[in-house]
From Swiss-Prot:
Subcellular location field: Cytoplasm
Description of activity control: The formation of the proteasomal ATPase PAN-20S proteasome complex, via the docking of the C-termini of PAN into the intersubunit pockets in the alpha-rings, triggers opening of the gate for substrate entry. Interconversion between the open-gate and close-gate conformations leads to a dynamic regulation of the 20S proteasome proteolysis activity.
Ranges in coiled-coil conformation: none
Transmembrane segments: none
Organism, as annotated: Halobacterium salinarum (strain ATCC 29341 / DSM 671 / R1)
PROSITE patterns associated with the record: PROTEASOME_ALPHA_1 (PS00388), PROTEASOME_ALPHA_2 (PS51475)
Family: Belongs to the peptidase T1A family.
Pfam families: Proteasome, Proteasome_A_N
UniProt keyword NAD, yes or no: no
UniProt protein name: Proteasome subunit alpha
Record-level GO cellular component terms: cytoplasm; proteasome core complex, alpha-subunit complex
């Protein structure tokens, strides 16, 4: 009973480490991320692709109301997994930091600098009593000095730079697929194809243009844009056609 009471004390105290060096509230925040639908980032020489699962809980819910892709600045976009309201708070903070940089230095903020500002903000909420960690992870994609960059943030306030990465539900299977299929020479179109096929891993229902979101940061223009549902659907159709052709070839053999 005493051991159980001690664990409950560590659970309640965000600033208290357990004897084995764990912050339980941060770990619970990571679990909240795992409960969110998946988001995937793929970096290519031509730019960075963000693909998100906008799967809804009800057929009556408008897919356009599901906010998982976010424009931070002209050259930076983000994808989220976890608590939507927490993501909105971090996105607003990132936008403010980006605008401060433009006003102060008259130039766009660096992607690494922006990510560090966001993770520093996140980390503060793991040290202050009376607050809780953010139950969300972000993929921050952008162009810096003509080079595509892709970062992941964690509820602990750490960040990592990736070539390809997934956050949210089914991360393990999706990440394994990305590791097997990723190639450093991918085009943006190939990156979209890879991310959509990875998102399809382990799904019971079929992908649709309304059920996914696709964002692209173009390395040449240094701009972020999001695809319309019909554009996303055309990529999904190409994937399905390629799968059908492969099945036909197998039948002939």
């Amino acid at each position: 009973m005493q051991g159980q009471n001690q664990q409950q004390a560590y659970d309640r105290g965000i600033t208290i480490f357990s004897p084995d060096g764990r912050l339980y509230q941060v770990e619970y925040a990571r679990e909240a991320v795992k409960r969110g639908t998946a988001s995937i980032g793929v970096r290519t020489p031509e730019g960075v692709v963000l693909v998100v699962d906008k799967q809804t809980r009800s057929p009556l819910l408008e897919g356009s109301s599901v906010e998982k892709l976010h424009k931070i600045d002209d050259h930076v976009g983000a994808a989220s997994a976890g608590h939507v309201a927490d993501a909105r708070q971090l996105v607003d903070f990132a936008r403010q930091q980006s605008q401060v940089e433009r006003v102060r230095y008259d130039e766009p903020i660096g992607v690494r600098t922006l990510t560090k500002s966001v993770t520093d903000h996140i980390q503060q909420y793991t040290q202050v009593g009376g607050a809780r960690p953010f139950g969300v992870a972000l993929l921050i994609a952008g162009v810096e000095g003509g080079e595509p960059r892709l970062f992941e943030t964690d509820p602990s306030g750490t960040s990592n730079e990736w070539k390809a990465v997934a956050i949210g539900s089914n991360r393990g299977d999706i990440q394994e697929f990305l590791e097997d299929e990723y190639d450093a020479g991918l085009s943006v179109d190939d990156g979209i194809d890879l991310a959509l096929r990875a998102l399809n891993e382990g799904r019971e229902d079929a992908l649709s243009g309304d059920g996914v979101g696709v964002g692209i940061v173009d390395a040449d223009t240094g701009t972020y844009r999001e695809l319309a549902a019909d554009e996303s659907q055309s990529y999904i159709d190409d994937i399905e056609d390629a799968a059908d052709d492969s099945d036909d070839d197998d039948d002939e053999e």
